[in-house]
From Swiss-Prot:
Gene3D superfamilies: P-loop containing nucleotide triphosphate hydrolases. It comes from Shigella dysenteriae serotype 1 (strain Sd197). It is found in: Cell inner membrane. GO terms for cellular component: plasma membrane. Part of the ABC transporter complex AraFGH involved in arabinose import. Responsible for energy coupling to the transport system. This is Arabinose import ATP-binding protein AraG. Residues 8-243, 256-499 form the ABC transporter domain. It catalyses: L-arabinose(out) + ATP + H2O = L-arabinose(in) + ADP + phosphate + H(+). Keywords: ATP-binding, Cell inner membrane, Cell membrane, Membrane, Nucleotide-binding, Repeat, Sugar transport, Translocase, Transport.
């Protein structure tokens, strides 16, 4: 039940950076014993607000009110001492120190300048037990999993008696089991009467945890949903992006050209039976299937990431011998991989380098000198045309959001002579607004005659974007559906594993 008096209030919060107004007149309330979700596209202002709450930034206008008292934090330590803790996506812990040392860093119990390790480990053990964690407090942090690191960060907040705990995209690096454990802990913290702020683009998490949802757009407050029985996915999307859900996908019927890509009885590691399919010029074909269906494995084989063990790939009626990715690229077939951070981007290189790295070889001067003029113009062109949000082309790509990293990878392939593009989970980990931009790029590629084959486990996305849906099940094709005729029931029915009959 919502209390009459909020524990945390934002009153007219504004934040201006040189040339940029990040927040404008943000006002809303949060209550003790509730999980209050913050939603919005990248750049909507969620993280900026958390940094104001945590003392990283001072507001340009407005104030933060905690338990009826107007607060002004000079730094994060002041905020933490006032009971405010932020659990960021990138955890702020020291791997070489023990679990207990990390929990009580800055307030280690000591006497005469000597740390009382017995008391330290005892107190840390109590915090870990509170979270249901069976971890030896004397274990060096570096030996723990990311999920356990997160629990240590939460224990650190509890050790400082935090009454307000904010989570910023906390599940991005967690396994399903670790996510379940995190949700258990958050629900316990809610029962204890703490204010929980939760930032995520994953709507299934928002609906599973939240008692209220506040939506931001372009640095402004849009609305707060407090009746979770009356809010649904479509209403949230419309509040976040100002468009109906149908407009997010934006599919329209189009005409296709001749067959551009054909697989003839292709097998690859993880693909159980020979796969045969065709994609025409200008056609978008979606590959849908549950985990283990073989979608990613098929694409890796087609691109030369693994070896095709049988069958033949054809582009424009010509057989293509693909033994490594450079063979696929030379034939005009490009891949945006599922794991963009490990296989798509070069994290410690600039946006410019990541866009230009594939086509660079075609533009060198004298056969060996990088053509800086072409590289600068090409990168700037794709940054503008794809609306890549970055301070500049020299920004390290690892500092960009997932959506902007994906657009940079697309910019890389747009620099090549593309005939076929393979997209493996192209919008995973991307906010709704960036997804809309990715879909528009896909439609633009199709309009240029590119054959698009994209794999996704997001069924509404496949149904909303693809002209034709190929459903895979356990390494084989289970069936095909046309856009105008397909629905979720049909697609899921085809994707579900067959039930074996037990033999008596």
């Amino acid at each position: 039940m919502q209390q009459s008096t909020p524990y945390l209030s934002f009153r007219g919060i504004g934040k201006t950076f040189p040339g940029v107004k990040a927040l404008t007149d943000i006002s809303f309330d949060c209550y003790a014993g509730q999980v209050h979700a913050l939603m919005g596209e990248n750049g909507a202002g969620k993280s900026t607000l958390l940094k104001i709450l945590s003392g990283n930034y001072a507001p340009t206008t407005g104030s933060v009110v905690i338990n009826g008292q107007e607060m002004s934090f000079s730094d994060t330590t002041a905020a933490l001492n006032a009971g405010v803790a932020i659990i960021y996506q990138e955890l702020h812990l020291v791997p070489e120190m023990t679990v207990a040392e990390n929990i009580y860093l800055g307030q280690l119990p000591h006497k005469g300048g000597i740390v009382n390790r017995s008391l330290l480990n005892y107190e840390a053990g109590l915090q870990l037990k509170h979270l249901g964690m069976d971890i030896d407090p004397d274990t060096p942090l570096k030996y723990l999993s990311i999920g356990q690191w997160q629990m240590v960060e939460i224990a650190k907040a509890l050790a400082r008696n935090a009454k307000i705990i904010a989570f910023d995209e906390p599940t991005s690096s967690l396994s399903a089991r670790e996510i379940d454990n995190l949700f258990r802990v958050i629900r316990e913290l809610r029962k204890e009467g703490r204010v929980i702020l939760y930032v995520s683009h994953r709507m299934e998490e928002i609906f599973a945890l939240s008692d209220a949802i506040t939506v931001f757009k372009d640095g402004r407050y849009v609305r707060t949903f407090t009746d979770m029985q009356q809010v649904d996915h479509d209403a949230l999307v419309q509040a976040m992006v100002g468009r109906d859900i149908g407009d997010i996908y934006g599919w329209q019927p189009r005409s296709y050209g001749e067959e551009r890509l054909r697989l003839d009885a292709v097998k690859a590691p993880g693909v159980r039976t020979p796969i045969s399919l065709a994609v025409r010029s200008g056609e978008i074909v979606g590959l849908f299937g549950l985990v283990g269906a073989g979608r990613s494995e098929l694409m890796k084989g087609m691109f030369g990431g693994t070896q095709i063990t049988a069958g033949q790939v054809y582009i424009d009626q010509q057989p293509i011998d693909i033994r490594k990715p450079s063979h696929a690229i030379a034939a005009g077939m490009m891949l945006c991989p599922e794991d963009r951070k490990a296989e798509g981007i070069i994290p410690v290189h600039s946006v410019r380098d990541n866009i230009n790295i594939s086509a660079r070889r075609k533009h060198v001067l004298g056969g060996c000198v990088i053509n800086n003029g072409w590289e600068e113009n090409n990168a700037d062109h794709h940054i503008r045309s794809l609306n890549i949000k970055t301070p500049g082309a020299e920004q390290l790509i690892m500092n960009l959001s997932g959506g902007n990293q994906q657009k940079a990878i697309l910019g890389r392939w747009l620099s090549e002579e593309m005939k076929v593009i393979l997209l493996d989970e192209p919008t995973r980990g991307i906010d709704v607004g960036a997804k809309h931009e990715i879909y528009n790029v896909i439609y633009a590629l199709a309009a240029q005659g590119v054959a698009v084959l994209f794999a996704s486990s997001d069924l509404p996305e496949v149904l909303g974007v693809a002209d034709r849906i190929v459903v895979m099940r356990e390494g084989e094709i289970a069936g095909e559906l046309l856009h105008e005729q397909a629905d979720e029931r049909q697609a899921l029915s085809l994707a579900m594993p067959k039930v074996s009959q037990a033999v008596a």
